[in-house]
Amino acid sequence: VKEYSFYTGLSEEFVRNSDLRVEASDFRKELLRDEGFSVGRADSRYKMKDYVAAGQYPDTDASMEGFSSAYVSALHTWFSEIGVETVMLYQSSDRDLYNNWDWNSTQDQKWPRYVNPTPHIGYAQRGNEEFKVYVSCGIYDLATPCFTAENFLYDNGVDMERVIFSEFEAGHMMYNHQPSFDRFLKEVN
């Protein structure tokens, strides 16, 4: 409990009460609760004041609030410059879309829902000995944590000798951190 608390910044009491199983949303809410903030899901380096500090969940993803509007604005500007006419406004996220998405190949549960491609990767590797995998992840990403990706690959018949893991000092979108983006480009070229 002491080490867990030390490495995460969470109180020993919270870690103990969580039975050493702290969910990402609980971590986001609890880490800066005393200051009235929650940290971001896509990038936990971002923080945002919560309406109710005592609430169970963060009000929003502070990281998405930090950069979504810039990306949407840039996309609409680019569409205009290249002559693309859109009828609907592009949105960076849409709860209706998530709720109506066809989640084939998903676990049989309500949330979190995700598509797990790793059994297919393992199958493809067994059929093609040249098939290699590159996994890049940001260490501040609480939406798709690095160790989760690694665990999925280990658990689904993937030949780990043909997998390259690359961790970046960034969140989910490593291109938001210039040194990470530069290194990523070098690695994939």
Residue map of PLM features:
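Alpha/beta-hydrolase fold catalytic core
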Residues: V1-A143
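Feature representing long, continuous alpha-helical segments
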Residues: P119-G122, F147-E150, K186
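A cross-kingdom marker for long, charged
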Residues: Y134-C137, F165-S166, M174-Y175, E187
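Composition- and surface-driven signal marking solvent-exposed, interaction-prone regions
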Residues: C137, C146-N151, S180-F181
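Active-site-adjacent alpha-helix of alpha/beta-hydrolase-fold enzymes
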Residues: L142-R162
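Catalytic histidine neighborhood in serine/cysteine hydrolases
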Residues: G157-M173
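Catalytic histidine-centered segment of alpha/beta-hydrolase-like enzymes
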Residues: G171-F181
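Short, amphipathic alpha-helical "lid/cap" segments that border enzyme active or binding sites
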Residues: F181-V188
